[in-house]
Structures are given as C-alpha cells and as structure tokens.
C-alpha cells in the first residue's frame, strides 16, 4: 500500500531532522528472499517437534483438534521431509544470513522498511479454512514479507507505529540493526517516539 511506503519516507525525513544521515540502500539478498520453498523443511520439522513436545506435556497423543489446522498441516508435511531436505534448508538459511548481514558489515547502521506491505488487516481476514489450510500462511506471508528475513538472520528489529491513517489505523515502520545492537534500536526508537509520540493514539475497533 502507498501508505506503508509513505510511512517509511516520512520516518526517514524525521530521522534526518534529528541529525541522522539517510540513504536509499538495502541488502541485495532481500531482492530474492523466497522463504516459501527454501525453508519449508525447517518450519515443518520445527512444527512437528513442537507437536511432539505438546504430546509429552499433555501425556497423550495430540489430535487435529488440539492445534490450529495450519500448524497441524505443517507438522504432517514434515513426514515428507528427509534429513537431506532439512540439512539443505539449514545450509541455505546460513547462506542467506551471511548475505544479509554483509550489508551491515559494509558499514550501514540501520535499515528502515515497512513493517507490513498493506495496512492492518480486519479481524477475520486470516482464518484456518479446512479446504485450504495453508491459505493463512500465504496471506500472512504476503502481508509481512519484510519481517521473516530477520527472523531468519537473527537480527534485532523493532516496529514503531509512527504513522496513522485518517481512520486511526497505525502504519508500522520496521527498523533493523546488526547483531547485538539492540541498544542502538532502543535509542533511535526513543528519539522517534519523543519527536512524534504515539501513546495517545487509539485505533478504532
């Protein structure tokens, strides 16, 4: 959405007004960040392990009625994965992390992106549908394409609701730092909130 893009532009202008230097740059690895296929083996295997752990906690078999349908489907998909599939996904994940982190190693401090590609979705948009259990994951993936890369890379990131629509809907901006630089994120977010407070905003429900 244009409002998500504009939120980033306005945030960058605010950062400049606070004395920060802003340039148009990003990790080139993000241009081809396809998570749907490459890392399915990791996600589904982790879901299967989680389901097994839940069974141990409950002291019984976990049934399809115990967890969300999408999670159940992912756990079942893990049965199709081989050890080689999993190892390959872990290897690709490692390569991706290194490629993304190189941007920070080249001297950049922070990356500013939209938190979501669209404005916040109405309640009920993402649902578990028995006839298409993976639709929820697909919709979520289309909505938040720029947060999974940093879940994978393990870097600290923060979401700041600096912009608001005329209808009172928050428009989040994501700021990402290098490994171990949570201190930088908190300092910059504090500067932004002081300059443009958001605590008094209450979105309509």
Feature annotation, model-predicted:
Residues 1-44:
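Gly/Ser-rich, acidic/histidine-flanked active-site/gating loops
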Residues 35-46, 127-129, 173-176:
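Short low-complexity, flexible loop/linker segments enriched in glycine and/or proline
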């Amino acid at each position: 959405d244009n409002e998500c893009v504009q939120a980033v532009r306005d945030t960058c202008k605010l950062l400049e007004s606070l004395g920060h230097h802003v340039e148009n740059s990003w990790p080139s690895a993000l241009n081809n960040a396809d998570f749907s296929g490459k890392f399915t083996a990791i996600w589904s295997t982790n879901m299967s392990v989680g389901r097994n752990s839940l069974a141990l906690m409950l002291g019984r078999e976990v049934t399809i009625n115990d967890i969300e349908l999408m999670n159940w489907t992912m756990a079942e998909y893990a049965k199709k994965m081989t050890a080689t599939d999993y190892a390959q996904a872990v290897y690709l994940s490692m390569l991706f992390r290194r490629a993304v982190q190189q941007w920070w190693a080249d001297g950049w401090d922070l990356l500013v992106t939209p938190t979501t590609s669209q404005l916040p979705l109405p309640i009920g948009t993402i649902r578990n549908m028995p006839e298409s259990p993976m639709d929820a994951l697909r919709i979520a993936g289309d909505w938040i394409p720029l947060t999974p890369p940093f879940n994978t890379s393990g870097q600290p990131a923060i979401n700041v609701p600096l912009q608001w629509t005329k209808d009172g809907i928050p428009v989040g901006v994501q700021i990402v730092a290098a490994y171990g630089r949570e201190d930088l994120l908190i300092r910059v977010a504090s500067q932004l909130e002081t300059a443009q407070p958001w605590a008094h905003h209450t979105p309509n429900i």
